[in-house]
Amino acid sequence: MRPVVRVIREDWADTALPLPGYETAGAAGADLRANLPPESRAEGLVLAPLGRVLVPTGLRIEIPDGFEVQIRPRSGLALKHGISLPNSPGTIDSDYRGPLGVILVNLGDEPFRVAHGDRIAQMVVAPVVQARFELADGLGATARGAGGFGSTGTA
């Protein structure tokens, strides 16, 4: 059974913009759009190189218990313009009910304009497993041990 994510729009949101949606039958991520406040819609938001901005979606969501939503960059924006998410993936917990915003960062060399209605990120609905943490006297040995950050090679 597919989980249902309930969505409401902010009072100021543009209702002509579609809800998050999957562009293809095999898509894992549903596209999120910039839903800018009325006073910003005409000019959009300009993101300077190395700048960050919180882009509103005009939405709030209710995620079913046992699930999370991950906010991820769109590969085309990253490749063509250097636009990414500094906290990728961003995690939205099932008990959060506040506004859904997307933090964008411009890693490119040129200013980037976010227009009202642009697809700016994708959201992936994923199951959550909550672990139990236990204090231990030691950890089991492995071939890797404490090696990290490139310890297994790069080739």
Swiss-Prot record:
UniProt cross-references to Pfam families, sorted A to Z: dUTPase
Residue ranges that the Swiss-Prot or TrEMBL entry lists as coiled coil: none
CDD domains in the record: trimeric_dUTPase
Gene Ontology terms: biological process: dUMP biosynthetic process; dUTP catabolic process
Catalysed reactions, semicolon-separated: dUTP + H2O = dUMP + diphosphate + H(+)
Keyword hit for Metal-binding: yes
Pathway note: Pyrimidine metabolism; dUMP biosynthesis; dUMP from dCTP (dUTP route): step 2/2
Cofactor(s) needed by this chain: Mg(2+)
InterPro entries, per the entry: dUTPase (IPR008181), dUTPase-like (IPR029054), dUTPase-like_sf (IPR036157), dUTPase_trimeric (IPR033704)
Enzyme Commission (EC) number: 3.6.1.23
A GO MF term: dUTP diphosphatase activity
UniProt keyword annotations, A-Z: Hydrolase, Magnesium, Metal-binding, Nucleotide metabolism
Domain of life: Bacteria
Family annotation (PANTHER family): DEOXYURIDINE 5'-TRIPHOSPHATE NUCLEOTIDOHYDROLASE
Function as written in the Swiss-Prot or TrEMBL entry: This enzyme is involved in nucleotide metabolism: it produces dUMP, the immediate precursor of thymidine nucleotides and it decreases the intracellular concentration of dUTP so that uracil cannot be incorporated into DNA.
Family: Belongs to the dUTPase family.
Protein name: Deoxyuridine 5'-triphosphate nucleotidohydrolase
